[in-house]
Amino acid sequence: MIHKTSLPKDVEERLRSLGPALRQCSGVLFGYLFGGATVSPLKPLSDVDVAVYLDDSVNLVEGRLEAIGVVTTHLQTDEVDVVVLNTAPTALTGRILQTRRVIFDRDPFRRHLFESRALREFFDFRIFEHRLLARRYGNG
């Protein structure tokens, strides 16, 4: 995706320390990089995709805003997308989990539980999605 500003030249280095920076967000239980941010080198006009899972006691809007603030400050760019996994659609969650790189994990048991449930739902959903797309667009 083309954005207005280039990523900082040291963004790769900043990505390596993003996990510890997310520790500041007390409501974030775990976080992932996904999409283009998981492959090196990032293109100058790329964005950084981050997914976080928030504790149930945290207001989802406030937790997302706090995570966005920490990520943008740490990376020194506004070219970020932060997804809250608690409310993300099944298709998006599954695609995030397929390319994820764990950058922060405050609760490994909760993360494994989330991943196993979300991937089961996603694989069930994909069967339905493929059938729907085949009916809609045909087989070729």
Predicted feature residues:
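ATP/adenylate-binding site constellation spanning eukaryotic-like Ser/Thr protein kinases
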Residues: 47
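Catalytic core of pol beta-like nucleotidyltransferases
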Residues: 1-30, 38-40, 44, 55-140
